[in-house]
Structure formats: structure tokens, C-alpha cells
Amino acid sequence: ESLDRMTGARGEISRVPAVELAGLRLGESDQSIPLLREVLDLIDGRVPLIIELKNPRRRTGRVETAASKDLAGYGGPCAVSSFNRRTVAWCARNLPHLPRGQNVMKFRRGWFAAGQWQSSVFREFQTRHSTRLQFIGCHIGALPSPGAQRFRERGIPLIVFTVRTPDRLALANAHADNIFFEGFIP
């Protein structure tokens, strides 16, 4: 994930040391990027969390291991998700007690988990078996979708992101089981 979306700085967040991240500000605020452990301490189990692990690479382990160390001591309800199906599979092997979700979006050539090297989640239902998914995270702009509907028919909940307007809320209510909101209170 690029730093420019939330901080205006350039670079990939996974390549910047935590001490440097602490010096960056989120948007126009005086808030810095919190570490996962800081977020977990702040939330302290008061609300359920879905932790999105952002690892765009084929090789897994570094990001996932760091997150699992922080999550090991967390007593609150949480799940993990990723666009990277290898990350989700890593979590199935190493964090089997946590619910897992595969995030998907619609790219020009159809449904894909992020990355050119990944195959279509909706055309290859095998992802469900290799990662034992408990939910699918789906971009609202990709709905309605026959592929998303097939997952729901198989009992896998569909959580849509990111709803910012009342018309998108109506679309999400018609095609999904739960919703991520941003800058919008329904």
C-alpha cells in the first residue's frame, strides 16, 4: 500500500521503518500512523475488528508474522483479511483460530484478488478450500455480481467496502451481508 493515499508521502508503507512512519501525519491532522499494537491497545476488545494485511508480494511471512505477534496477545474479537490469497492461506495455517476473509475488486479483465500473478477468485472457487474463508470483502463498485452472489449462496458472507453515499448504501443492502462505511453515517 502506498503512503500517498493517507499521508501525502511517497513510497510503499511496508518498506518504511516504524520509526519513520511515526513521523508522518495522517491527512491534514496532527495524528501519526499508529502501530497495530497501539490500535489493539486503544480498542481493547470494545468493538470487533477486521485487520487487513497488505502484502502485495508472492512471498509471505514478514508482514503476516509481525501482525500475528501483535494479535497473539489480543483478547478482543477480530478477523484478518487480505487481497493476497497467499496471505489468507498463511493465516489459515498459522492463525487458524481467527476468521479469514479474501478481499476482491473488479479490474478491467474481471474479478481478481490484487496482483497480476493471482487468478480470479470468482472463477476459481478453489481459493475457498485452500484458505477456508469465513467471508469475502468486496468493493462496492463491483456490485451487482453473479460471482459475489455465488459465494453468498454457498453461505459465505459478503462484506462490501467502501460505502460513502446513500445510493451506495441501497446497493450494498441489496447485495451484501455487511458494510464498511467511510465518511458517511447511515
Q: Residue spans of the language-model regions?
A:
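Metal-dependent phosphodiesterase/phospholipase catalytic core, i.e.
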Residues: E1-R108, H129-Q134, C138-I140
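C-terminal active-site rim and adjoining tail of enzyme catalytic domains
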Residues: Q31, N103-V104, G110-P186
